[in-house]
Amino acid sequence: MGRSLKKGPFIADSLLKKVEKQNSNDDRSVIKTWSRASTILPVMIGHTIAVHNGKSHIPVFITEQMVGHKLGEFAPTRTYKGHIKDKKGAR
């Protein structure tokens, strides 16, 4: 179930302020954020936002196709190292 339309999309206030400040100054430096739950808005297109994955910040360049998705979708939190091929060969 999605979020109610009358509430609007969730975005952290601090993140929105940083994006709007950079838009007014024509600055495109990387913005660090821990807010993985924030929705990507059209105002963010062209910015690089470093999203925290629990260990480090992953830089994510925002494009038009990402609008409406969450920032956390583009910064994976788990690493998959593959299955062990053969336990007998390891001995």
UniProtKB/Swiss-Prot annotation:
Q: Does the keyword RNA-binding apply?
A: yes
Q: Which GO terms describe its molecular function?
A: rRNA binding; structural constituent of ribosome
Q: Name one GO biological process term.
A: ribosomal small subunit assembly
- Keywords from the UniProt entry: Ribonucleoprotein, Ribosomal protein, RNA-binding, rRNA-binding
- Which cellular component, as a GO term, is one annotated location? cytoplasm
Sorted alphabetically, which Pfam families does this protein's record hold?
Answer: Ribosomal_S19
What the entry lists under PROSITE patterns is as follows: RIBOSOMAL_S19
Q: Which domain of life is it from?
A: Bacteria
Q: So what family is this one in?
A: Belongs to the universal ribosomal protein uS19 family.
Which NCBIfam families does the UniProt entry name for this protein? rpsS_bact
Which function does this protein serve?
Protein S19 forms a complex with S13 that binds strongly to the 16S ribosomal RNA.
* Name of the protein in its database record: Small ribosomal subunit protein uS19
Provenance organism: Prochlorococcus marinus (strain MIT 9211)
Taxonomic lineage from the root: Bacteria, Bacillati, Cyanobacteriota, Cyanophyceae, Synechococcales
Which gene is the coding source of this polypeptide chain? rpsS
